[in-house]
């Protein structure tokens, strides 16, 4: 269990509690979680973070009424900047989006502006929102993570408790390599409910070569680990930077959706540009 799982900042969350579903607009349903909760134990300070990045959200269950009462549907794309004070708690995000269902808006841009304003207020940071009509996305191919998949290794694993021990002495030689490694075996659990979170992860780096067996064992050790998606990605970035000391590093995870939302955080210390096309399990 994470050291901050019982922190008072989490006590008021609706996550893990019985809730009413409201279908008229209510911005107060949104709840934020301080990023400092997981950054402080990692020694990460807001004014000197070793990375930049965003939390990319896809909103699949977004609907409202137009001015004449006709329902509208869209797919939303939200990017929340890494410098925001809070991350957005996903169940509260779902409840908030449900509150649009029977609410009239004059036009699509009013919906977009409302989302941007409310999410920015909750996160206390920069948020961008784009809305897409369904025909704009129809026929879009399933994406994939570029890189070498490290999953098909003939190894025995019997430990699923999180540990950084696998990253000790995980690099070898003095030769500098530049490679992209991919795993689809990332599984962690919600910090509050302990429900499973399934994801694929892409690790791009330049530096001494990382032992792929040790890296895979490290990633599999998240299997019983309880943390939010964004926190796991920052932990992985921080651990790789600390133990493997690459010159350049980017970590990008795309998680399967829950409640009509998927969360796709990335962190990088270079000019990494994430792909935004959904993966096969999304």
UniProtKB/Swiss-Prot annotation:
NADPH binds at residues 90-91, 258-259. Pfam families: QueF (PF14489), QueF_N (PF14819). Substrate binds at residues 88-90, 229-230. It catalyses: 7-aminomethyl-7-carbaguanine + 2 NADP(+) = 7-cyano-7-deazaguanine + 2 NADPH + 3 H(+). It comes from the Bacteria. One of its GO terms (cellular component) is cytoplasm. Keywords: Cytoplasm, NADP, Oxidoreductase, Queuosine biosynthesis. It is found in: Cytoplasm. Its EC number is 1.7.1.13. Pathway: tRNA modification; tRNA-queuosine biosynthesis. InterPro entries: GTP-CH-I_C/QueF, NADPH_dep_7-cyano-7-deazaG_red, QueF, QueF_N, QueF_type2. One of its GO terms (biological process) is tRNA modification. The active site is at residues 190, 197. GO terms for molecular function: preQ1 synthase activity. SUPFAM superfamilies: Tetrahydrobiopterin biosynthesis enzymes-like. PANTHER family: NADPH-DEPENDENT 7-CYANO-7-DEAZAGUANINE REDUCTASE. Homodimer. Catalyzes the NADPH-dependent reduction of 7-cyano-7-deazaguanine (preQ0) to 7-aminomethyl-7-deazaguanine (preQ1). Belongs to the GTP cyclohydrolase I family. QueF type 2 subfamily. This is NADPH-dependent 7-cyano-7-deazaguanine reductase.
């Amino acid at each position: 269990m994470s050291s901050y799982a019982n922190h008072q900042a989490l006590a008021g969350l609706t996550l893990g509690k019985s809730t009413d579903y409201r279908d008229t607009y209510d911005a107060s349903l949104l709840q934020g979680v301080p990023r400092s909760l997981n950054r402080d134990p990692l020694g990460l300070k807001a004014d000197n973070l070793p990375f930049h990045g965003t939390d990319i959200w896809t909103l699949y269950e977004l609907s409202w009424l137009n001015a004449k009462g006709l329902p509208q549907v869209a797919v939303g794309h939200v990017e929340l900047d890494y410098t925001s004070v809070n991350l957005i708690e996903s169940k509260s995000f779902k409840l908030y989006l449900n509150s649009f269902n029977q609410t009239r808006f004059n036009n699509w841009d009013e919906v977009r502006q409302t989302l941007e304003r409310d999410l920015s207020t909750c996160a206390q940071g920069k948020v961008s929102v784009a809305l897409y009509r369904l025909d704009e996305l129809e026929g879009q191919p399933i994406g994939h993570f570029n890189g070498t998949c490290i999953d098909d290794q003939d190894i025995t694993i019997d430990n699923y408790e999180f540990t950084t021990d696998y990253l000790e002495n995980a690099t070898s030689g003095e030769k500098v390599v530049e490679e992209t490694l991919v795993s689809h075996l990332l599984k962690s659990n919600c910090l509050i409910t302990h429900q499973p979170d399934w994801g694929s992860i892409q690790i791009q780096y330049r530096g001494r070569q990382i032992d792929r067996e040790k890296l895979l064992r490290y990633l599999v050790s998240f299997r019983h680990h309880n943390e939010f998606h964004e926190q796991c990605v920052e932990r992985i970035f921080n651990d790789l930077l600390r133990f493997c000391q690459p010159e350049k590093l980017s970590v990008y995870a795309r998680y399967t959706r829950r409640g009509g939302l998927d969360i796709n955080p990335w962190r990088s210390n270079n000019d990494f540009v994430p792909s935004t096309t959904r993966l096969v399990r999304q």
